[in-house]
Amino acid sequence: LVLDGVFNHMGRNAPIFRSAEAEPASVYRNWFVFGPQFAGGARAWWRAENLPELNLENPEVREHLFNGHDSVVRSYLRDGVDGWRLDVAFDIGFVYLEELTRAAHAEKPGSLVVGEIANYPKEWFPSVDAVMHFALRHLILRLVNGEMDTVTFARMLERMVTECGIENMLRSWIYLDNHDTPRLATTVPDERARRLAQVLQFTLPGSPNLYYGGELDMPGGDDPEMRAPMRWDLVSDDNAALAWTKKLIAMRQHHRALRVGDFRPISSHRLLAFERHTDQVAETVLVVANPGDEAVTETLMVANSKLMDSTEMVNLLAQHPGAPIRLWASLLQVTVPARTALVLQPQVAPPGGYTNYKRVQ
């Protein structure tokens, strides 16, 4: 259970702010920044007068929010929550985020602090344990909507994984929509492109983060549509989006490499291809995605020395077995239909009892 913490600002009608605003001698006066230069009389988040910002430079504020024994962050962790998702974490800044994260870990080792950070994530670690992956969301949506080619996507992704580190990537949340964005069914109107985006959400290094209704293809544009109530009328056994989401969840649960595996890019001209792997070759997963409008046949080099020649690869997303896909001397020829992905795993224990993986794990 991860709670949403808004520690940068509060509502104008909050008793603490009302006291500070009304009484210059209030004990809460220095919890905010007042002055005639601000519309509404106090510094407010993005100049929204109803959202006065907290003065985090005041140690008393930080003591109340996260440093003190009875602070908001620490008391809720003691009560059993597992972590915090920090609203507008980029506004809190590196220094105070790191202070908050240290306080959380001191109170509850292993607790998670996830920052809503729209910036390039590299330097925000270890100020937070993880980020909401704005950059990866934009990359995925641009790819499946035909606004970015696979080579550019692969280059940017590889740089981000290398610079941020795989552990930080694995902890971070991969989301495709939330309460601040139009919903996926609206931003990606093509159904096959939408399904492809979801495959990437569940196979790229990170933790998939689902927004209620997304599993049902619930539509929604700008505010207030993006925050509309749940569409319970869409829940049915016939909902293809729900069935697809359940399939992706089960696939990720059953294949360890998709949860904790390392990442290795696979070079391609027209496809997006990458490998997720652990210390066990049997857990290796290859992902080959085609965001284009036409089927693509290409030969890829899979630079994994543990994968044996002539290994058959099983497509984890296939409804019915198709033509066998085999790895020959590290080369893999694939045909990927338009706006589709293959998620392949090596068959290391084929029927018949013999395996050339007997001394390779």
Regions picked out by a protein language model, each given a short descriptive name:
Residues 80-82, 175, 335:
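Short loop/turn motifs at secondary-structure junctions
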Residues 78-81, 129, 206-207:
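A structural motif
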